[in-house]
Amino acid sequence: MTSSRVENSSSRAARKVKLALMGPAFVAAIGYIDPGNFATNIQAGASFGYQLLWVVVWANLMAMLIQVLSAKLGIATGKNLAEQIRDHYPRPVVWFYWVQAEIIAMATDLAEFIGAAIGFKLVLGVSLLQGAVLTGVATFLILMLQRRGQKPLEKVIGGLLLFVAVAYVVELIFSQPALAPLTKGLVIPTLPNGEAVFLAAGVLGATIMPHVIYLHSSLTQHLHGGTRKERYNATRWDVAIAMTIAGFVNLAMMATAAAAFHFNGHTGVADLDQAYRTLEPLLSHAAATIFGLSLVAAGLSSTVVGTLAGQVVMQGFIRFHIPLWFRRAVTMLPSFVVILLGLDPTRILVMSQVLLSFGIALALVPLLIFTSNAQLMGDLVNTRWVRVTGWVIVAIVVSLNGWLIVGSLLGVA
């Protein structure tokens, strides 16, 4: 009897430790459903139906492994990826890494901020500039939670992630995608033409996010409670749950666009405003409103995460710290410039996702090197299959980027 009570008590304690350690992956996962994903997935679904769903599946599986490695680095070493690069690489390389990481973070934030502004515009009927002002105010308010510690922010961002997921369950109900072709698109790889490869690279850039590779290792480097092994096991569950939700949302975005647009003859839908206007008569006003609200939720939460990632990058690489409010104010400026110049915001979103894919390999290579170093990682060092899989992912990313460069120069993509 006593033995049974002790076992139950230790089991409850283990569950409490696991629950207490959950959260960082939900912050990282929000970067995987930002407005850039909306733009890229809608364009891919409208243009090619279900044919590129398999790209989302494989990109999400890659992202799961990458986020586990990033989180593991923080747990094993007590330092984030940027700090490890600073400690192990020559100063010129560190400065190069810092500059490119800041550019990637700014490109990401541009997509996220403008996406939220578009969402406010669609839902409230305000101008894009007014939507940008609302986005700025809302993100400042969310960032204020950071003063109370990491957990309150994790809960708010996790709640927004779940809201977007529920919103897309509703969108799937409205759009009613055909199961047979959807299943075929999930499991059979196909790239019909050069535009499909360009969009596939965009989907990859939208799904695997360089800035959250840096951020996740920072979120786990100060985790407390349980043994190191318990923290790692809890983190794997955290990543599995959060990234499964993010993967579902990305698949649902593309499937909804395919069902609502592609198979109703609207194959040219590549604009978030156009998607909203087209959804209303095709499905319903409610479906269009839910789309707009999910865009706001994704944009606000992901732009907050982008601001945090930028802070981690600066502190990690060059040991320089600026207040979060100042960073938020500075990184809003490119978005306002794009809006005031009247540039096509959706085109900016899609191009930013392609740009992001160029930063993936630069973050992945040192991550793989460090997590494969037994002296650094101890018993959490990568196994052989993880190392091989990681380098295959790097090869795929570099190959896609090479094709993009050649294709763009030759006018193929």
Curated annotation (Swiss-Prot):
Main localization is membrane
Q: Describe its membrane topology.
A: Multi-pass membrane protein
User: Which Gene Ontology MF annotations are present?
Assistant: cadmium ion transmembrane transporter activity; manganese ion transmembrane transporter activity; metal ion binding; symporter activity
Q: Where in the cell is it found?
A: Cell inner membrane
User: What is one GO cellular-component annotation here?
Assistant: plasma membrane
Keywords carried by this UniProt record: Cell inner membrane, Cell membrane, Ion transport, Membrane, Symport, Transmembrane, Transmembrane helix, Transport
Pfam families in UniProt = Nramp (PF01566)
Give me the segments passing through the membrane.
19-39, 46-66, 94-114, 122-142, 156-176, 196-216, 241-261, 290-310, 329-349, 350-370, 392-412
InterPro entries attached to this UniProt entry: NRAMP_fam
What are the GO BP annotations of this UniProt entry?
Answer: iron ion transmembrane transport
Function of the protein: H(+)-stimulated, divalent metal cation uptake system.
Q: Hey, which family's this protein in?
A: Belongs to the NRAMP family.
Against NCBIfam families, the record matches this protein to:
nramp (TIGR01197), Nramp_1 (NF037982), PRK00701.1 (NF001923)
Write the protein's name: Divalent metal cation transporter MntH
Organism, as annotated: Klebsiella pneumoniae (strain 342)
Name of the encoding gene:
mntH
